[in-house]
Amino acid sequence: MDEPPFTEAALEQALAEPCELDAALLTDIEDMLQLINNQDSDFPGLFDAPYAGVAGGTDPTSPDASSPGSPTPPPSTMSSPLEGFLGGARTPPPPPVSPTQPAPTPLKMYPSVPAFSPGPGIKEEPVPLTILQPPTPQPLSGALLPQSLPALAPPQLSPAPVLGYPSPPGSFSSATPPGSTSQTLPGLPLASLPGVLPVSVHTQVQSAAPQQLLTATATPVVSPGTTTVTSQIQQVPVLLQPHFIKADSLLLTTMKTDMGTPVKAAGIGSLAPGTAVQAAPLQTLVSGGTILATVPLVVDTDKLPINRLAAGGKALSSGQSRGEKRTAHNAIEKRYRSSINDKIIELKDLVVGTEAKLNKSAVLRKAIDYIRFLQQSNQKLKQENLSLRTAAHKSKSLKDLVSCSSGGRTDVPMEGVKPEVVDTLSPPPSDAGSPSQSSPLSLGSRGSSSGGSGSDSEPDSPVFEDSQMKPEQLPAPHGRGMLDRSRLALCVLVFLCLSCNPLASLMGSWALPGPSDATSAYHGPWRSVLGAEGRDGPGWVLWLLPPLVWLTNGLLVLLFLALLFVYGEPVTRPHSDPAVRFWRHRKQADLDLARGDFAQAAQQLWLALRALGRPLPTSHLDLACSLLWNLIRHLLQRLWVGRWLAGRAGGLRRDSALEADTRTSACDAALVYHKLHQLHTMGKYPGGHLDAANLALSALNLAECAGDALSVAVLAEVYVAAALRVKTSLPRALHFLTRFFLSSARQACLAQSGSVPVAMQWLCHPVGHRFFVDGDWAVCGAPRDSLYSVAGNPVDPLAQVTQLFREHLLEQALHCVAQPSPGPGSADGDREFSEALGFLQLLNSCCDTAGAPACSFSIASSTAATAGTDPVAKWWASLTAVVTHWLGRDEEAAERLYPLVEHLPRALQESERPLPRAALHSFKAARALLGRGKAESGSASLAMCEKASGYLQDSLAATPAGSSIDKAMQLLLCDLLLVARTSLWQRQKPPPPSQASQGSSSGAQASALELRGFQRDLSGLRRLAQSFRPAMRRVFLHEATARLMAGASPARTHQLLDRSLRRRAGPCGRGGAAAAAAAELEPRPTRREQAEALLLASCYLPPGFLSAPGQRVGMLAEAARTLEKLGDRRLLHDCQQMLMRLGGGTTVTSS
């Protein structure tokens, strides 16, 4: 400290000298102060002095202290703050006011005006800081006066409570002993030190925030006597001694004073007369918790760091009241809770949906469970990806492995990868400097750590966690097989070699000498010398040449067959990568089939075949090659050569495991081909007839090669599908192949199991075989909406053909009853009824084995091996059988079928067509009138007939142009109702013996209600006869009955009965063609109809219409003989009773 002391004369000289600040700087400072004045209203009570009673202080109510409401300082103060700083005169500003120098006054301590209400973590203590005298007086540069501050020992920090506010343990205080408010140099009065400026700085340290806040204000005032000079300073830094304060984190902030309130600063020093002091703020450096006082510096708040501004804002906001703090805290908490609730609601919508109602705990629990499920799924997928990637890497070459794994990057630890996987994935070191072990994991880590360029960054490699693959599970080199076009090219090459036989030509030209060699041995320029042929000529070569050529050709053919069937056939080993991919696609296809997504199922089956190394043809050339190869292969397998070689696929050596794998692979491929063929047949898979034929042949060839790996039922189903393809796609001239495939299916079943599957037994029946081969039917893609049977499996064409056959049997049985064949054998017995019952019995057996239920969509399942039922077809068959038994007057057989007919199936109950209800009510009415049970009353029976008639009329009106089976069923029901009404009429009013003997029909008239119902049913029968000609012969008989019931003129009745009794002779002589045409238009009556007409004529016609007196008895006798042959026991009983009345107890026997 060798500088001269700072004297009062030097201070006056420095203040008197003109300032070197230019006009621009002055203008900026004025603008800054004006800004401070404008913003002063933001903190009106910032520098108020609410505390009094400090030692050495003055009363806040004294005249020296300005009131808070005064807008301007008193007149004794300087004209402007700038003049107080500069102390010199300028041209624009007024001259400075030179204050008088009063006598030195004792030092007074004033408390610093707090910027905000102190909180519990703030401690206030006034700290006097003494500024030593500088060595030499220097002129003031601008508004700042540099000073030399000697370093003193750092004072001890003592946490003492001030102003009634408790101090927390972690707070800091100024270096003032407890109980003292100011500190001066010991032993010296402050006034006796000229040139010394004693300043007391009030320090506030806040330690509640992470960064401690140090706020201080120091306003030196030149005071003559009681004159107070108020300095208003914006951004006043702390003036500290050059000592170190240890703190965790301190931040120096600035404060501003109230422009309208002159406040006395704490720690005003007394100056000698003539001295002027200007405040020199010092900027402190904060680094590592240590504060060091350095050169004074004023920092603009606009250029402060954000953290300092935030800290200052926090300091200002902490001065609010406790209520405002609580309100702000509540608002923050409300926003926090609202944010949490929004996120929980969003989480609930993601996990359980928007409609669910759960509390927060349940939502979090559900989210945790879902996250665990996703983690487990992710783990499984990673393991599966690992196995697939491992197999892919193992199958690649070294170059491909290095190229695909050198740029990869992964963060998976090496302990998650098994050693065999690392050995497989690690190529050998390429140079001497490379490490001995290298893997995609290590390569990725080196690549990521060594370079920083963007070219080295590659996509992340898959996570290798675990591998269950074993070396013996990998596919064999020959597992891929040959393509069909390669096979066909090899076949064509061998065929050309065998047909052209170039080997024989080559061997012949090599073995046999040429013509010139046989005649001359040497050709000179002038003459030729004939050579002599040796005695042992090439005869043995000529003898050995043909066998050698054929042996060589045979070896070539065997080699060709071995390449095609043994080494060219793809074999999939279990647990290999192709097997894993195949089963994945196949299981997905099963799920798609069960879901009804047939297009996606076909796509999965296509991918499954590709995984097995048997891709489907994608072009016309590939399709032609594949079809020709399958034809050639099928022919070779029929010769047992191809089947024997195909059983050795994979190698000629005998290996039981390899043979089993070969059969299993062929079985899997055959099932997929067969299912694709079924989907194509049902219209679920696109493609033409050639594609379908190729699929059928591929399935058939592989099924024959599968052997015992494929069940007998599936093999028979494949044969039947091939026969169905011949029936559908090939022309009629080639339909004989259908018999061949059906015979092969039957032989395969009988050879292995000795029985035919239940769902295919109808194909072995002559009627079923004839229907399949010669029937005019077609398979449609959409399920058939039939009233007489239920559809089976929608993806099985055989189930649809079986449904068509059941309806065909029902139709044949109805035609046998409604339209029997008028052959010569029909008079020998009940042929029409026996044939109908035979068809119905076969129909019942087919209904019991209707095929698999519609829900079995598995590819491996066979519809032929499982049995189902067809309740709809069974109900119609039972109803037809009951009606047939009624018409044959066999009540015992009909009663056994009553329980099956009484309950209508649910499918028919839900049907909108009235025909099933008409059939049910007709059955009930006929059972009441024709059965052996207790007879119902006339009114009840008539009511049931009327109800059945109403449903039947609705059915006739709804289907005017229905199918032949609908018309046959309507004819059967109409006839049944008319027969029931006739029986009701005969039961109520039987002809008495006198009227029967006289032939009078006047007494047997029915009621008007009965006649009205009979006429309605008869009109329905006439309407049906217009479109269905077999109903015409029943119209004549029932019309005659209606006239008899009404008592009409017997002449027309006799004509109608005569048409039923007339027997037409064969066409002969003139008019034979016209008679034949008439016979075709009008069907001939059956033997039963003739017997019924004879019975009606003999019972109800008057005697005048009979030619002879004994003709009535003869007609009854003939009718009795006919009914006895037909087996109609009820009509036979009625006929015998009539003969007994007419003949005096005589009976008629068959002659």
Swiss-Prot record:
<keyword id="KW-0333">Golgi apparatus</keyword>
<dbReference type="GO" id="GO:0008610">
    <property type="term" value="P:lipid biosynthetic process"/>
</dbReference>
<feature type="topological domain" description="Cytoplasmic">
    <location>
        <begin position="1"/>
        <end position="487"/>
    </location>
</feature>
<feature type="site" description="Cleavage; by MBTPS2">
    <location>
        <begin position="490"/>
        <end position="491"/>
    </location>
</feature>
<feature type="site" description="Cleavage; by caspase-3 and caspase-7">
    <location>
        <begin position="460"/>
        <end position="461"/>
    </location>
</feature>
<feature type="modified residue" description="Phosphoserine">
    <location>
        <position position="117"/>
    </location>
</feature>
<feature type="transmembrane region" description="Helical">
    <location>
        <begin position="548"/>
        <end position="568"/>
    </location>
</feature>
<feature type="domain" description="bHLH">
    <location>
        <begin position="324"/>
        <end position="374"/>
    </location>
</feature>
<feature type="topological domain" description="Lumenal">
    <location>
        <begin position="509"/>
        <end position="547"/>
    </location>
</feature>
<feature type="modified residue" description="Phosphoserine; by AMPK">
    <location>
        <position position="397"/>
    </location>
</feature>
<dbReference type="InterPro" id="IPR036638">
    <property type="entry name" value="HLH_DNA-bd_sf"/>
</dbReference>
<feature type="region of interest" description="Disordered">
    <location>
        <begin position="39"/>
        <end position="125"/>
    </location>
</feature>
<feature type="region of interest" description="Leucine-zipper">
    <location>
        <begin position="374"/>
        <end position="396"/>
    </location>
</feature>
<keyword id="KW-0753">Steroid metabolism</keyword>
<dbReference type="GO" id="GO:0000981">
    <property type="term" value="F:DNA-binding transcription factor activity, RNA polymerase II-specific"/>
</dbReference>
<keyword id="KW-0472">Membrane</keyword>
<feature type="modified residue" description="Phosphoserine; by SIK1">
    <location>
        <position position="403"/>
    </location>
</feature>
<feature type="transmembrane region" description="Helical">
    <location>
        <begin position="488"/>
        <end position="508"/>
    </location>
</feature>
<dbReference type="GO" id="GO:0008203">
    <property type="term" value="P:cholesterol metabolic process"/>
</dbReference>
<feature type="compositionally biased region" description="Pro residues">
    <location>
        <begin position="91"/>
        <end position="105"/>
    </location>
</feature>
<keyword id="KW-0443">Lipid metabolism</keyword>
<feature type="compositionally biased region" description="Low complexity">
    <location>
        <begin position="431"/>
        <end position="448"/>
    </location>
</feature>
<keyword id="KW-0256">Endoplasmic reticulum</keyword>
<keyword id="KW-0597">Phosphoprotein</keyword>
<keyword id="KW-0804">Transcription</keyword>
<feature type="modified residue" description="Phosphoserine">
    <location>
        <position position="98"/>
    </location>
</feature>
<dbReference type="GO" id="GO:0006357">
    <property type="term" value="P:regulation of transcription by RNA polymerase II"/>
</dbReference>
<feature type="compositionally biased region" description="Low complexity">
    <location>
        <begin position="995"/>
        <end position="1006"/>
    </location>
</feature>
<dbReference type="Pfam" id="PF00010">
    <property type="entry name" value="HLH"/>
</dbReference>
<dbReference type="GO" id="GO:0003677">
    <property type="term" value="F:DNA binding"/>
</dbReference>
<dbReference type="GO" id="GO:0000978">
    <property type="term" value="F:RNA polymerase II cis-regulatory region sequence-specific DNA binding"/>
</dbReference>
<keyword id="KW-0153">Cholesterol metabolism</keyword>
<feature type="region of interest" description="Interaction with LMNA">
    <location>
        <begin position="234"/>
        <end position="497"/>
    </location>
</feature>
<protein>
    <recommendedName>
        <fullName>Sterol regulatory element-binding protein 1</fullName>
    </recommendedName>
</protein>
<feature type="region of interest" description="Transcriptional activation (acidic)">
    <location>
        <begin position="1"/>
        <end position="59"/>
    </location>
</feature>
<feature type="modified residue" description="Phosphoserine; by SIK1">
    <location>
        <position position="338"/>
    </location>
</feature>
<comment type="similarity">
    <text>Belongs to the SREBP family.</text>
</comment>
<feature type="modified residue" description="Phosphoserine">
    <location>
        <position position="1060"/>
    </location>
</feature>
<keyword id="KW-1133">Transmembrane helix</keyword>
<keyword id="KW-0238">DNA-binding</keyword>
<dbReference type="GO" id="GO:0005634">
    <property type="term" value="C:nucleus"/>
</dbReference>
<feature type="modified residue" description="Phosphoserine; by SIK1">
    <location>
        <position position="339"/>
    </location>
</feature>
